[in-house]
Amino acid sequence: MSHVVVKNDPELDQQLANLDLNSEKQSGGASRASKGRYIPPHLRNREASKGFHDKDSSGWSCSKDKDAYNSFGSRDSRGKPGYFSERGSGSRGRFDDRGRSDYDGIGNRDRPGFGRFERNGHSRWCDKSDEDDWSKPLPPSERLEQELFSGGNTGINFEKYDDIPVEATGSNCPPHIENFGDIDMGEIIMGNIQLTRYTRPTPVQKHAIPIIKGKRDLMACAQTGSGKTAAFLLPILSQIYTDGPGEALKAVKENGRYGRRKQYPISLVLAPTRELAVQIYEEARKFSYRSRVRPCVVYGGADIGQQIRDLERGCHLLVATPGRLVDMMERGKIGLDFCKYLVLDEADRMLDMGFEPQIRRIVEQDTMPPKGVRHTMMFSATFPKEIQMLARDFLDEYIFLAVGRVGSTSENITQKVVWVEDLDKRSFLLDILGAAGTDSLTLVFVETKKGADSLEDFLYHEGYACTSIHGDRSQRDREEALHQFRSGKSPILVATAVAARGLDISNVRHVINFDLPSDIEEYVHRIGRTGRVGNLGLATSFFNEKNINITKDLLDLLVEAKQEVPSWLENMAYEHQYKGGSRGRSKSNRFSGGFGARDYRQSSGSSSSGFGASRGSSSRSGGGGYGNSRGFGGGGYGGFYNSDGYGGNYNSQGVDWWGN
């Protein structure tokens, strides 16, 4: 075989030249100056420069004067980390996340008003919109409004909360407000307050909102169900809307490309449990509706990869449990360099659960601004002296706020203690549930996980629609159980202490302590699940010889709350006190004076008219506390049930808690 070199003749060269893609003929009249540049087929009938002139770095057309929040149907700059599309200001074309389960049923939702973003990976820290005025509301969304604001009520005794005493100690305390309109919180916050149907602030909100708006540190003690969450979310979000993202925005942009950049939240809220963290996050969703603030939540027991992906889309307000937050910080996903607001909710519970090392790691041993630069708030139902002393390390010239009988219980809760042997508890429980009917939510507390499963099985086989939660359940199972309970599909929830703290389950009519806790503070938080925000509630506790260690504290608590005290409980408390005293450290002194917590900076012998007279002893003469209750609240359960049932008449016509 021979190899012949064939040279191109002039005719072949001419044919190849005629195939020039940049010739005048094929480019539709393009200028000769553009010769040498390849033009895609779909642009060959346009001007050579059209489609390339005003492009961003990703290659997609992007009008610079176009609002990133109002782009119906336009390409969404996929791959460009600093820009995202909103898919329209109305409902057309908006991504609907119904039926999708993120975070095992909670959290991470692609939602307008919360950082509208595509799931292709766009950052909430967008180049254009974040430089706009953060105080201006974004367009509304009817679907999102329905999702966020479709439940809840103010409670039949909400107006009575005005009688609750309040004491604030500290230098230069700002005056309290009477209505939300008394202080400027901006258009977005006021609009969301109307959507939540809040008619007037609760006592803790009246005092905490102006304190936080005045950029003062705060330690607040308030009874459960008093509106603590809104008390810190409203002023913090209001300040973020007013001040904008500040240096945090620049830090995120300079930190790296999408997928590797660290997020710098402006506000951090720490909570002891994942349930409470999710609850705070859902409240933050409400109050950040139609704003550019994007809340996020991270907690243990859920897919950390999904949480990281959610964080990478941007985070301005972060709600977290301490353990998972430390994990995120060590992974380089969260930086606290520009955190202006720190909130510790249920602070005593976090310390009881052993989170103090993680809290100190977060607050003192990382890059968080020091006290005096950041603004720190502590909220809890109880604040004993030990925790107040710890607060010296986190708070700077703080104001101590005591609202209601902190560490005690609300008089909206009727408490009943009955003697029940262990073998009789299940039959007693059936009697109670049979008298209650199926239209009210009942929360049953037990001490062990095995006991929760066993009792749920028993009630199920007795024909009751019930569910249960405890620490061994997966996050998905726990969320599903809470959803079934809240919706009324399973009106009976059996729970261990994991559900006792901070959960805001509205309309819980009855709390039953099937097993009493060994700690009186745990008892306070358990029964605080009912009677929330002015609603009337009922708490029944099964007592026997196993619970003798809390006899004295329980008696003091019932006396202070003007509840009916069984004679056998008084006798047991007397005998127990004079036969060697209470086993373990008595905590009854925490409830003296009506509030249960005092500012340790004040003299231990001082008193305040806001607290009422100190009880001093277990006398039932009515010292301390608040309200104008007569005797022990008018006898019985005030008509909750129409059955004689057990331990007294449930339909007593005596004087109610408010003297009616």
From Swiss-Prot:
Crosslink feature (Glycyl lysine isopeptide (Lys-Gly) (interchain with G-Cter in SUMO2)) location: 213
Name of this chain's protein: ATP-dependent RNA helicase DDX3Y
Molecular function GO terms recorded: ATP binding; ATP hydrolysis activity; DNA binding; mRNA binding; RNA helicase activity
Chain intervals for the UniProt region annotation (Disordered): 1-141, 579-625
SUPFAM superfamilies: P-loop containing nucleoside triphosphate hydrolases
Domain spans labelled Helicase C-terminal: 412-573
Subcellular location(s) of the protein: Cytoplasm; Nucleus
Biased composition (Polar residues): 15-29
Top-rank lineage group of the source organism: Eukaryota
Its biological purpose: Probable ATP-dependent RNA helicase. May play a role in spermatogenesis.
Modified residues (N6-acetyllysine): 55
Self-association and partners: May interact with TDRD3.
